[in-house]
């Protein structure tokens, strides 16, 4: 644990993590559930720093069945997912609380939206610097390096931090 920055609170059997436990990753993602032979095994939940969670049944470290719930309570559906698509373009908060009047459009599910640093992209779990290809969480802690596919997706899809628009002369 000391080399990875992780923390483990639970039992050991033959030097392996086993039984009911809490495992905290360096990113502050927490797993609370069953372990067997050092792996997630049985029922367990991943709690993410963003407030979202993934409840699952695990077998030898792999997901058998799971359910992802966003921090606002929206549950992901892997079939017939119509969230914020061409079928229904509303954000979850707009579904729950209604649309705003014309001229006060909502840009993200979070309203008001998060301020994005100049030249960076908001990729959902942090800010992405396209020059260094590094994604840091919203508290400026390293999350990961983006591979070519993720870089292309972020640049094509995500909101970018721009300079404020100059005021028009009346």
UniProtKB/Swiss-Prot annotation:
Principal subcellular localization: other
The species this protein was found in: Mus musculus
Organism domain of life: Eukaryota
Cystine pairs: none
InterPro entries: MORN (IPR003409), Morn5 (IPR042814)
Protein name as it appears in the record: MORN repeat-containing protein 5
GO-annotated cellular components: sperm flagellum
Pfam families, per the entry: MORN
Cellular compartment(s): Cell projection, Cilium, Flagellum
Encoding gene, per UniProt annotation: Morn5
MORN repeat locations: 8-30, 31-53, 54-75
PANTHER family the record matches: MORN REPEAT-CONTAINING PROTEIN 5
Tissue specificity: Only detected in testis (at protein level).
């Amino acid at each position: 644990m000391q080399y990875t920055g992780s923390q483990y609170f639970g039992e050991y059997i033959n030097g392996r993590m086993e039984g009911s436990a809490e495992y905290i990753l360096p990113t502050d993602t927490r797993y609370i559930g069953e372990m067997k032979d050092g792996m997630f095994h049985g029922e367990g939940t991943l709690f993410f720093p963003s407030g979202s969670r993934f409840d699952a049944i695990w077998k030898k470290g792999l997901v058998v069945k799971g359910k992802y719930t966003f921090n606002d309570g929206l549950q992901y559906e892997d079939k017939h997912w119509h969230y914020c698509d061409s079928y229904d373009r509303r954000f979850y908060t707009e579904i729950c609380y209604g649309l705003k009047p014309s001229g006060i459009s909502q840009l993200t599910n979070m309203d008001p939206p998060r301020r994005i640093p100049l030249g960076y992209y908001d990729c959902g779990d942090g800010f992405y610097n396209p020059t260094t290809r590094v994604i840091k969480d919203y508290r400026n802690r390293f999350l990961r390096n983006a591979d070519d596919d993720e870089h292309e997706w972020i640049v094509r899809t995500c909101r970018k931090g721009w300079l404020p628009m100059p005021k028009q002369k009346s």
